[in-house]
Curated annotation (Swiss-Prot):
Annotated residues for binding of Mg(2+) 2: D10, D134
A GO term for molecular function: RNA-DNA hybrid ribonuclease activity
Biased composition range(s): Basic and acidic residues: 126-138
Quaternary data: Monomer.
Cofactor binding, note field: Binds 1 Mg(2+) ion per subunit. May bind a second metal ion at a regulatory site, or after substrate binding.
Tree of life domain: Bacteria
Protein name as annotated: Ribonuclease H
Length: 177
């Protein structure tokens, strides 16, 4: 039987494009792990995607996942649009490259490793975990906001095409999933 994990994700951006951050909460068997990261120049949609990708990639083995996002972009993309994009060689219906295509491909790969049920939650509506994921996203963005930018060492890029977050933090990690 695969491990059952609950994930809550959010992305944030100051300006669009501008400095941005993402946050994720992973909950398994009474243990909570919080992740966050950010980029100096990005969009809110990229941060929403990176939150989901980073959370799913943090799982060490295939799991049954309930993933909660407040992003209609991520929900529609993963549940509706992605099938056509893949069929069309990662092109839209009008033959243009999919925006954030490298991130969609990374999310597709991460999604296929697990049994994921995707859930949409209304953002900024008092949903406790979504509010915390938003706080984590803002924390991830903070080092890149004007006046507080401190260059961080880049994490090694496992996929040269995939833009990895420059800074990633994990908190309250007592067990690897």
């Amino acid at each position: 039987m695969s491990k059952q994990v609950e994930i809550f994700t959010d992305g944030a951006c100051s300006g669009n494009p501008g400095p941005g951050g993402w946050g994720a909460i992973l909950r398994f068997n009474g243990t909570t792990k919080e992740l966050s990261g950010g980029e100096a120049e990005t969009t809110n949609n990229r941060m929403e995607l990176l939150a989901a990708i980073s959370a799913l990639n943090a799982l060490k083995e295939p799991c049954t996942v309930e993933l909660h996002t407040d992003s209609k972009y991520v929900m529609d993309g993963i549940s509706k649009w992605i099938h056509g994009w893949k069929k069309n060689g990662w092109k839209t219906a009008d033959k243009k490259p999919v925006k954030n295509g490298e991130l969609w491909q990374a999310l597709d790969e991460a999604n296929r490793r697990h049994k994921v049920t995707w859930n949409w939650v209304k953002g900024h509506a008092g949903h406790t975990e979504n509010e915390r994921a938003d706080e984590l996203a803002r924390e991830g963005m903070a080092p890149f906001k004007k006046g507080s930018f401190k260059p961080a060492a880049s994490a090694p890029k496992p996929d040269a095409q995939l833009k990895q977050p420059v800074a990633t933090k994990a908190r309250r990690s007592t067990q690897s999933y």
